[in-house]
Amino acid sequence: MKVIDQYVSDRVSLYNGDSIEILKGLPDHCIHYAIFSPPFSSLYTYSNSDRDLGNSTGDDQFYQHFLFLVKELARVIMPGRLVSVHCMDIPKMKSRDGVIGLKDFPGELIREFENAGFIYHSRVVVWKDPLVEATRTKALGLMHKQLCKDSAMCRMGLPDYVLTFRLPGDNPEPVSHEAGLSRFYGEDEPKGIKGARPEPDADLVAKKEKYNTEPVYSHQVWRRYASPVWMDIRQSNTLNRTAARDEKDERHICPLQLDLIARCLELWTNPNDIILDPFAGIGSVPVVALQMGRRTMGFELKESYFKQAVLNCQKEENHDDSNI
């Protein structure tokens, strides 16, 4: 396995290096689930490494290189198990693309995974505040003054998406929730009866009146998780990324929301499953995996992010959340 540096303990393995090369060193079908946020083509610059997918010369080169990663994922994921990808539509910029518009990044990713043999399993929209986007990006299409001037150029804000793909085959280790869902990840937790619903009142049944009017907690949680739009992901609930910024960074990273990670792990993994993030950044996925009793593996090319990921995982292993 070609790595620059590594941190390995009983439940976590972190590697500083090229994710595609590291994946080649893993045995077949050894990963239960993968979740990650890939470089968004050349939208962000993460490092000056030639191996960084974010430094592709254009979209065609990015997708050509990304397919190598997807093919390796198809080899290491267990049959019947899943890979989830966080993504969004990519803005077209007049200075770079010649026009103002959007690129269908999620659609391209779906085609990449299907070309590698995966089955397109699901998509969920993660709501984001358009005012926050407008303030951060100054996008013309979100400006109120543009609405007043010529609303033909106005657009909606850009949500996040979580695309999930399934590797064909029978799942040898079913993901079971025999007692339903007993916890909730997100804001505004639903209310309801936890555990078995009590027996109905015989008198009310005889009178044909309502009984068991209080909802079951697991049903309410599943209703929220099964929604095609997740309105309840806390956008600010992320790992502290301050320590991972270099002076040479052109743009800082935006770590994945912890609620989103936890929700996916709750739905699609068992305790002690091995969770992979091939673009681990500062360790958001490994940290949540450890918190939820999973084993985890993460790859990160950039040294400063890798070192911060190690610190974050060590703090979680030592139950010290002072920097999270």
Language-model features, listed with the residues they occupy:
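Core catalytic lobe of class I
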Residues: M1-Q308
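Class I S-adenosyl-L-methionine-dependent methyltransferase module
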Residues: E108-L109, V310-I324
